[in-house]
């Protein structure tokens, strides 16, 4: 029996609901970026889904506050600026997650209680789309935004069980998951001094290597699980037939897949759970799909997910261990995070020796102390955490009132339970800020890892990220230090010099200012704020700062951070030094296709369309051919694509004299440009 859905109208006013919806949307976008781009999730899948579900429920109750760019309407993105962009030729959507039998069976009963369903392993790896033409592998593309992905074909060709030539000259587009077996991961990680957290992160990072020779060294594999056969004369009636065809084409498919009646799904799940711990590859659940293709077509899609499939996520596996020690770390933002050292246990294929405690409230609630026997789980199969205390240890651990690094009295920020060190000169804060700046997804400075940066700071060579660009002046002294020989220094200096080629898109987020990460930076660029100089100009004008609230995805907390950061003399001095060092303080233009008919144009979309579902597909097309997609109409918008149901955007476009296209006119425009949109989106 399904549970009655929670409502919020009795507890939230419209004003409060608007704020909560905006805050939830920002938070979800942040976690989508961490998961899809950085491969560094901060929360479990379950916690993410609870955020997502609450936002979706609130948007249903308060539809007037639903943003057209809400995370509930789009797929998370793993787009990377280092790769050519590729317009997907089939929908690349995500699945709605379920976490218990009741929730899953409720969906089955509503969908087709007597129908046949496939039940298969949900592989925990990196999502990929393979495009074959006439039997030859043409492209391997990441999921990306769902419309446009990163072309990683050269890397995909190195995956050992992907066929490069098929036994028949067929055109087929497939979805699959690149992964690494536990055995291969352990062996590779041992050779790499244990620096990789888990198979999923390593797999995702491997297909994004800039040099395919590096990818080839990594023992990657793939399972394919769905396909589209454009132009194929034989129409498949079932998912079972599609999987059978894939096997005949020599594609590996997930093992143990079964096809059962809806009434047998709960029993089947129990059988899969018994097998889970014996698998040689990482999985975080099951995928249940309608087998009948015609029934799938009848169910259709939301803009985010197919209605005919669900992911069933396993409960986190727990293992018992003993707490050996409790320590705390001061991050670059000043946040003080406790963690426990435990006796080693194996979880989800990796050896775990540390687990998170989050904050003092969490510690007090569990009663954590040294010597305690605890249960540890990997949240979402990734993040180890103490979930339960079985036998208490010594006194419950207390986070100190003073920063463990600089002894400054700690503070609590508004509406947060965490403690923070407020001292911007705190050694641990500064060191972690420099470490963050040098990371691959930031300024990507080769040769400068955690240990090297800690050494350079502790021995007085650097005190800020700007000091990195003067480090070469100290070469004669540095070369005398252990571990900093001629070869090592050459790599470091080359890495520092190479970082000057990273533009504003990377520089602003890498500085590490609160609320100004990659997502906000992209939003600013989308709205024409594409340089540090432009930001500093806005920061001097309160009206212009307030106008940033008109950008969907930017809320009051971002505005507050904007005001505080760019009036801070320390930040202004840092920016001046980076500018003098020759860094690129303006965003470079991005090209995704050799053909650029929409170059210099900014398009917005509103209403609904027959040929573009969801409507963002039309904007993906514009971006692919050189244009820019914007989420709101402004004086800088050049074109508006308007369909039935267009509202305030159309009114504003008419007021501003912006060129407006309806769907037929847009299709005629594409035809005149010799763009076959059906072969592109």
UniProtKB/Swiss-Prot annotation:
It comes from the Bacteria. Keywords: DNA damage, DNA repair, DNA replication, Ligase, Magnesium, Manganese, Metal-binding, NAD, Zinc. One of its GO terms (molecular function) is metal ion binding. Residues 593-681 form the BRCT domain. NAD(+) binds at residues 45-49, 94-95, 120, 143, 177, 289, 313. InterPro entries: BRCT_dom (IPR001357), BRCT_dom_sf (IPR036420), DNA_ligase (IPR001679), DNAligase_adenylation (IPR013839), DNAligase_N (IPR013840), NA-bd_OB-fold (IPR012340), NAD_DNA_ligase_OB (IPR004150), RuvA_2-like (IPR010994). It catalyses: NAD(+) + (deoxyribonucleotide)n-3'-hydroxyl + 5'-phospho-(deoxyribonucleotide)m = (deoxyribonucleotide)n+m + AMP + beta-nicotinamide D-nucleotide. One of its GO terms (biological process) is DNA repair. This is DNA ligase. It comes from Leptospira borgpetersenii serovar Hardjo-bovis (strain L550). The lineage of its organism: Bacteria, Pseudomonadati, Spirochaetota, Spirochaetia, Leptospirales.
């Amino acid at each position: 029996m399904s549970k009655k859905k929670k409502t919020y109208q009795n507890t939230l006013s419209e004003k409060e609901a608007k704020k909560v919806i905006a805050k939830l949307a920002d938070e979800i976008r942040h976690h989508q970026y961490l998961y899809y781009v950085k491969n560094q999730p901060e929360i479990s899948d379950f916690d993410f889904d609870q955020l997502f579900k609450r936002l979706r429920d609130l948007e249903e109750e308060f539809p007037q506050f639903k943003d057209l760019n809400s995370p509930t309407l789009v797929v998370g993105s793993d787009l990377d600026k280092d790769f050519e962009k590729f317009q997907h030729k089939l929908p690349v959507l995500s699945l709605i997650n379920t976490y218990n039998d009741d929730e899953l069976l409720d969906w089955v009963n509503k969908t087709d209680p007597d129908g046949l369903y496939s039940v298969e392993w949900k592989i925990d790896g990196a999502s990929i789309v393979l495009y074959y033409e006439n039997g030859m592998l043409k492209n391997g593309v990441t999921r990306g935004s769902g419309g446009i992905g990163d072309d990683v074909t050269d890397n995909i060709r190195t995956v050992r069980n992907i066929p490069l030539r098929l036994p028949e000259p067929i055109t087929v587009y497939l979805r699959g998951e690149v992964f690494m077996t536990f055995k291969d991961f352990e062996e590779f990680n041992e050779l790499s001094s244990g620096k990789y957290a888990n198979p999923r992160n390593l797999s995702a990072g491997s297909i994004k290597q800039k040099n395919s020779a590096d990818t080839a060294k990594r023992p990657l594999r793939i399972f394919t699980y769905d396909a589209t056969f454009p132009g194929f004369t034989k129409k498949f009636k079932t998912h079972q037939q599609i999987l059978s065809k894939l096997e005949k084409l020599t594609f590996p498919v997930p093992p143990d897949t079964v096809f059962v009646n809806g009434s047998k799904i709960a029993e089947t799940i129990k059988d899969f759970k018994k097998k889970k711990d014996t698998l040689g590859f990482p999985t975080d659940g099951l995928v249940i799909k309608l087998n009948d293709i015609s029934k799938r077509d009848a169910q259709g899609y939301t803009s985010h997910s197919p209605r005919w499939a669900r992911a069933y996520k396993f409960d986190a596996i727990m293992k018992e261990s003993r707490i050996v020690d409790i320590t705390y770390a001061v991050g670059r933002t000043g946040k003080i995070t406790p963690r426990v050292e435990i006796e080693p246990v194996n979880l989800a294929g990796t050896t775990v020796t540390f687990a998170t405690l989050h904050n003092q409230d969490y510690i007090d609630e569990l009663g954590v102390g040294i010597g305690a026997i605890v249960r540890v789980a990997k949240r979402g199969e990734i993040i180890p955490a103490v979930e339960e205390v079985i036998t208490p240890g010594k006194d419950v651990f207390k986070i100190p009132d003073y920063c463990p690094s600089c002894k400054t009295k700690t503070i609590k920020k508004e509406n947060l339970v965490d403690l923070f060190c407020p001292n911007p000169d705190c050694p641990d804060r500064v060191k972690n800020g420099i470490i963050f700046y040098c990371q691959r997804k930031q300024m990507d400075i080769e040769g400068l890892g955690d240990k090297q940066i800690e050494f350079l700071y502790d021995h007085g060579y650097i005190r800020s990220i700007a000091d990195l660009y003067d480090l070469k002046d100290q070469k004669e002294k540095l070369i005398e230090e252990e571990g900093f020989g001629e070869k090592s220094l050459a790599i470091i200096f080359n890495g520092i010099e190479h970082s000057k080629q990273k533009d504003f898109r990377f520089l602003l987020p890498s500085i590490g200012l609160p609320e100004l990460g990659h997502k906000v930076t992209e939003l600013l660029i989308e709205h024409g704020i594409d340089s540090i100089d432009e930001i500093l100009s806005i920061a001097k004008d309160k009206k212009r700062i307030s106008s940033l609230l008109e950008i969907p995805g930017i809320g009051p907390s971002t505005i507050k951070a904007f005001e505080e950061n760019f009036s801070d003399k320390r930040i202004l001095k840092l920016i001046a030094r980076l500018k003098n060092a020759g860094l690129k303080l303006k965003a470079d233009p991005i090209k995704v296709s050799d053909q650029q008919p929409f170059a210099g144009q900014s398009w917005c979309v509103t209403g609904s369309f027959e040929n573009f579902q969801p409507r963002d597909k039309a904007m993906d097309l514009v971006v692919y051919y050189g244009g820019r997609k914007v989420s709101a109409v402004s004086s800088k918008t050049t074109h508006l694509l308007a369909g039935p149901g267009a509202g305030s955007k159309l009114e504003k476009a008419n007021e501003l004299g912006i060129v407006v296209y309806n769907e037929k006119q847009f299709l005629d425009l594409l035809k005149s440009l010799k763009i076959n949109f059906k072969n592109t989106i």
